[in-house]
Structures are given as structure tokens and as C-alpha cells.
Amino acid sequence: MKVEDFDFDLPEELIAQTPLLDRTSSRLMVLDKKSGDIKDQHFTDIISYLNEGDALVLNDTRVLPARLHGIKDETGAHIEVLLLKQKEGNAWETLVKPAKRIRKGATITFGDGALKAICLEELEHGGRILEFSYEGIFYEVLEQLGEMPLPPYIKEQLADQDRYQTVYAKENGSAAAPTAGLHFTEDLLAKISAKGVEIIFVTLHVGLGTFRPVDVEDTANHKMHSEFYRLTEESAERINKIKAQGGKVVAVGTTSIRTLETIASRHDGKLVAESGWTEIFISPGYTFQAVDALITNFHLPKSTLIMLVSALSDRTKILAAYNHAVEEQYRFFSFGDAMFIH
């Protein structure tokens, strides 16, 4: 299919720049994936669509405050570093600006010297492998010195960094939030659990590739970025049992879907304990083996994520729903409203 087939007109003012005061006060568009019927509701209405014996699968990754500002030791030049992916030991793949100032062997100091880095390798497109040195625990140092790496379409400063974390975030490693999960509070999850719905966690560390535009004309030629995922034995067994008993598997976010479908596609539809890297690209024509329904935000035109949701329903129904969302002034992207495709 052509990438252009997934385009739609989006007024810039519908791109949410800040989160709502209350996480659960977002709107919820409910889309019947087969008929295309649309209902405009509130996010807390999600409870009525979840039944006893269903599974609600959430991604418990935690966003790192991965943007660092430092000084090149040799010249005093200001350097911005964005952590992308942990390599061996204290080495990280990073994006450096301005990259031309940091060559192999160059050193950078952050803050008052609590964190230092040396460039081990130069990569293309401003990428650098940096090895960090510090006292104590790396993630605690990051909390002191780093900033949240908000998506490029969000222009306003975030007053409270916790609003770009889910309330259940636990596993450090993401460069961006699994934003469908931002709508949940502990109270809402407790109400869902009390209804007999099983709350199950997976882990997928979201990379910055999630914001990278698709730069080919035909979707068949697109190569996905890789992201680390993990599913525990307990979670795999619980989901398999629910499916065997006829319960629905409802994924919260495209990252949860990518985790479950990666594993199911390798094991004849079954889920097993597994960790690794996935480059799964889900687009129309894909046959889902693990997931029945999806809670997600509204995605960018021509993005791999709108292709994924089109695979769960179909392209014409999704684009009709998106056009309805524009007409009804839904809020889009990371801090925007939600959609339930079932």
C-alpha cells in the first residue's frame, strides 16, 4: 500500500500541548472494528466495555529523563545528548547536538561533574556511542540532571514530569511514553480489577524511532526501528489461560500490541516468556494472533501507528473515525484523547 493512503488533514490546534488536569477526563472514541460504528464517550466509560475474564495488558516501561546538557571539556562548547539505547556496561547509543563537535575520544561533563562521558564511536546522523562514568546509581544521577525528551510536536514545557509517566511505570528504559496508558489512574485500574478483569503487564522500551517519519512511498519497503521487549512467564501463562477460556485480550497502546504479537507470531499464536528486540511492522493484511481489542491515542498522519490501527480494523474505517475526531475537536497525539477499537 502507498504511505499516502494513510494521510489525513489535521488542524494544528488539535495537537494537545499539555495533559489535562485529571488523567481520566479525556474523551474516548469507541470504534466497532467490523461495522465502523462510532460512539463518543468519556474515558471512564471504558469500564463498561471490559468484562469479567478479560485481560487488560499494559506496558510498564518507565521514561528516562534522557535529555542531558553538558560541556565539551576541551573547548567549553555546549553539548546536548539524548540517550537512545543502552549497550554493554555504561555505554549508550546517543544522539548528540552539535554532533560535529564530538569526535571519538572527546569528553563531556554534565552538571557539576557528577556525570562524565567519553565518545567511543561515531555513528551516522549525529549518533554517538558514549561511555558514562559517575558515582552511585546511574538512573538516580539521570533523575538529577536529565530532562524528559518530549515529542517534537509538543512545544510547551511540561510543568510536572510525572505527567509523562504512566502511574504504573516501573522498568527504566524508554525514550518516550506509552501514551495510551497515561489515561489510567490507580483508582480506575482498581475499579477495572474489581470487575474481574485481569490487569497484566508487559515491557517494551519505546525508542525515538516511534516519531521518525516513514521515508518510503510504499509500506512494503519500510523497515521498522528495533525496540526491546520482555514478557514474564507469569504474564504469558495468564494471557494464554484467558484466551483459552474465551476472554478477550485488550491491549493498552501499540507497544503492548507489538510485544504480544511479536511473541505470538513466533510461537503459533501462543505466548511464552521471552525477551529480545522486535522490529515487527503491523500494517493492513496482518493477522492478529494475540490481541482482540486496543486502547490507543490518535496518531500522526502517514505514521506506522496509524497503519497498525488500520490493520486491526481497516483503513477506510480508521480514516473515517479520524475525520470524525477532527470534526468533533478531539485532542490528538501524546497528551490527547483516546480511542477504543473493539
Curated annotation (Swiss-Prot):
Pathway: tRNA modification; tRNA-queuosine biosynthesis. Keywords: Cytoplasm, Queuosine biosynthesis, S-adenosyl-L-methionine, Transferase. Pfam families: Queuosine_synth (PF02547). It is found in: Cytoplasm. InterPro entries: QueA, QueA_dom1, QueA_dom2, QueA_sf. The keyword S-adenosyl-L-methionine applies. One of its GO terms (molecular function) is S-adenosylmethionine:tRNA ribosyltransferase-isomerase activity. GO terms for biological process: queuosine biosynthetic process; tRNA wobble guanine modification. It is an enzyme of class 2 (transferase). It catalyses: 7-aminomethyl-7-carbaguanosine(34) in tRNA + S-adenosyl-L-methionine = epoxyqueuosine(34) in tRNA + adenine + L-methionine + 2 H(+). Monomer. Belongs to the QueA family. Transfers and isomerizes the ribose moiety from AdoMet to the 7-aminomethyl group of 7-deazaguanine (preQ1-tRNA) to give epoxyqueuosine (oQ-tRNA). This is S-adenosylmethionine:tRNA ribosyltransferase-isomerase. The gene is queA.
